[in-house]
A protein has these predicted regions:
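Non-transmembrane, aqueous-exposed alpha-helical and coiled segments at domain scale
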Residues: 1-422
Length: 422
């Protein structure tokens, strides 16, 4: 068996949570391979809205194994709050959620460091979520991290050493803070975490594959936030691309099957950083309002713009995408015309590739007729208006990959599969 991978292709917030929930009935295992509680996967069904930050989206399917991989960074306090909310809704986590011993822990001082580093940068700040993600990955790379498996061996000693090191840094930054409440909640989270099964996730996943089990790997954020291939330095601290599933779960490259790339029918971005197709007019405000574009974790209003096919083609290339999934088509239902960026202008020269630095590039647009039809109640591609089919054909021609799934609303039922005869 091979693993299938679901990735965001833009700057995150593409709607991965809903799609994973739609796809999970086809899989035995759902595994999260990177990121932390800085990104939220929003799912909406049966009239209730859920936001998952660290827990894989397969948790809503009663018979699935869910794995938090070694590439994930975990905040015990936030994990406890998230898990208890799910348990209160009737979902049994203890038996079905396994956590890699090699996953790194976000310490209370990591969150303080995150705030201190951002404050020190002033106007040059990245716009982090303040969840301690960057400092945790920094400790991981510098071989100073504390891992889930450390809870079982010499934990107090390792925690104290990390805390002392962080406090020394904070002293140098002259940053005032109070750790007491954060620490209190964190240690309660540690005790709660001990109720879960800690595993060597690389052995577990490869063993499940050997037994013929199907596995879906779930990424957080999006390709354009990848630490290497995103719009650096306005990126996250982990590899969000397809290869991140290999390092974040212990899966060999030849074990990868389908790669689902998910994107919105337009573009959004949260926080600072270049955004070539960003709209600053009433059209941008309209997309934001219709799309309810507010961060599920931060509560921040998202920046909105037209779809960027240059960035999307780049993401498809580095991820090896085999199937595309388009979200939030319904947000554009009322637009008379729709624009798509097909090239950039750099110093007056037109280019069709994603350059080293996208700061200051100008988008080159083509205009397409809108479909001006309410698609939210449609259940089959046979109901798609002619203009929407033309839009899909244009995207497939530009991107070279089929759009297999189209979302026409927030509910899991508002999901239409195409090419079902294949």
């Amino acid at each position: 068996m091979k693993v299938d991978i679901l990735l965001g292709l833009q700057w995150g917030d593409e709607g991965k949570g809903k799609v994973v929930d739609v796809l999970t009935p086809r899989y035995d295992v759902v595994a999260r391979f990177q990121g932390g509680p800085n990104a939220g996967h929003t799912l909406e069904f049966e009239g209730q809205k859920y936001v998952l930050r660290s827990i894989p989206s397969g948790i809503f399917q009663g018979d699935k194994v869910n794995i938090i991989g070694n590439g994930v960074v975990l905040d015990p306090a936030l994990f406890k709050a998230e898990a208890e909310a799910l348990e209160a809704s009737g979902h049994n986590l203890k038996e079905r959620l396994h956590i890699s011993k090699k996953a790194h822990l976000i310490l209370p001082t990591h969150r303080i460091l995150d705030a201190a580093y951002e404050a020190a940068k002033g106007d040059a700040k990245v716009g982090t979520t303040g969840k301690g993600i960057g400092p945790t990955y920094t400790d991981k790379i510098s071989r100073n991290g504390v891992r889930v498996g450390d809870i079982l061996h010499d934990f107090d000693k390792k925690y104290a050493a990390a805390k002392a090191r962080h406090e020394q840094i904070l002293k140098g930054l002259n940053y005032e803070y109070d750790l007491s409440e954060l620490e209190k909640a964190w240690f309660k989270g540690i005790e709660y975490l001990k109720q879960f099964k800690f595993v060597d996730s690389e052995h577990e996943i490869n063993g499940l594959l050997a037994d013929g089990k199907s596995v879906l790997c779930e990424g957080a954020q999006g390709t354009m936030l990848d630490i290497d291939f995103g719009s650096y330095p306005f990126v996250t601290s982990s590899n969000t691309i397809c290869a991140g599933a290999c390092t974040g779960l212990g899966i060999a490259p030849n074990k990868i099957g389908e790669v689902y790339g998910i994107f919105k029918a337009y573009c959004t971005r949260v926080g600072a950083g270049p955004f070539p197709t960003e709209l600053f007019d009433k059209t941008g405000d309209q997309i934001c309002t219709l799309g309810h574009e507010v961060g599920s974790v931060t509560g921040r209003k998202r920046r909105c713009g037209w779809i960027d096919l240059v960035a999307l083609k780049y993401a498809i290339m580095v991820d090896g995408v085999t199937k595309l999934i388009m979200m939030k088509s319904d947000v554009l239902d009322s637009f008379e015309t729709i624009k798509a960026c097909v090239a950039y202008k750099v110093n007056g020269e037109e280019i069709d590739y994603f350059p080293f630095d996208i700061e200051g590039v100008e988008p080159v647009y083509v205009e397409l007729p809108g479909w001006q039809t309410d698609m939210t109640k449609m259940q089959s591609e046979d109901e798609f208006p002619e203009e929407f089919n033309a839009y899909l054909s244009f995207l497939e021609e530009q991107l070279g990959v089929p759009v297999k799934i189209v979302s026409v609303g927030p509910d899991r039922e508002q999901t239409i599969e195409r090419y079902t005869e294949e």
